[in-house]
């Protein structure tokens, strides 16, 4: 993935642990440590990993106020950035860049009219949960635009960052250590 035979991967905010489990199962020579600020989420993720036979570790951590674990080649977060304000997003991105030996990856929603329409439609078509009906559009409204994410990354010191659109209404931030 980043030109090393064995690498260490630190996903943040993936409360159910599915991403770390899936990566471990598809790529056995990877050291994964997932973090989340909620102890119950970490407990569920660890239990899930153990049942799947995945050698994945999880830790309770508040990434905005605590030091991230060191020594990871790739540090990533998925569907987490839109929960933060601008200052928090810059703080998180800077901490991720400091921690990552090789790469930072951020996958998140993009704030757009199209995304808002899709969130409304998908929430109504795919679930009967009134919580999802409210939360999906709210998440899109609090997300950043592509240009805003680019600005946040540069403010965090991620020179050379690329931010690209992904289907359906997502973005991928990629930064490689020079």
Model region roles, listed by residue range:
Residues 8-65:
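Class I SAM-dependent methyltransferase SAM/SAH-binding core
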Residues 76:
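A conserved beta-strand element that flanks and buttresses the S-adenosyl-L-methionine
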Residues 1-8:
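Conserved alpha-helix/loop element of class I SAM-dependent methyltransferases that forms part
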Residues 109-158, 162:
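C-terminal alpha-helical "lid/dimerization" subdomain adjacent to the S-adenosyl-L-methionine
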Residues 100-109:
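Conserved beta-strand signature within the Rossmann-like core of class I S-adenosyl-L-methionine
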Residues 80:
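Hydrophobic adenine-recognition pocket in adenosine-nucleotide-binding enzymes
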Residues 84-96:
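A short, conserved alpha-helix within the catalytic core of class I
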Residues 161-178:
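Core SAM-dependent methyltransferase catalytic element
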């Amino acid at each position: 993935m980043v030109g090393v035979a064995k690498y260490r991967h630190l996903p943040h905010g993936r409360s159910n642990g599915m991403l770390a489990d899936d990566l471990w199962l598809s790529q056995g020579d990877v050291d994964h440590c997932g973090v989340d600020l909620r102890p119950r989420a970490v407990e569920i993720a660890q239990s899930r990993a153990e049942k799947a036979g995945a050698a994945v570790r999880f830790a309770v951590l508040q990434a905005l106020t605590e030091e991230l674990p060191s020594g990871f080649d790739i540090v990533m977060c998925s569907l987490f950035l839109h929960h933060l304000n601008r200052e928090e997003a810059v703080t998180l991105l800077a901490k991720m860049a400091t921690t990552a030996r090789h790469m930072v990856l951020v996958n998140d929603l993009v704030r757009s009219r199209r995304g808002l329409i899709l969130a409304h439609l998908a929430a109504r078509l795919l679930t009967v949960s009134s919580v999802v009906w409210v939360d999906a559009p709210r998440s899109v409204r609090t997300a950043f635009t592509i240009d805003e994410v680019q600005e946040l990354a540069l403010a965090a010191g991620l020179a050379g960052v690329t931010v690209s659109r992904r289907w359906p209404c997502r973005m991928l931030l990629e930064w490689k250590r020079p």
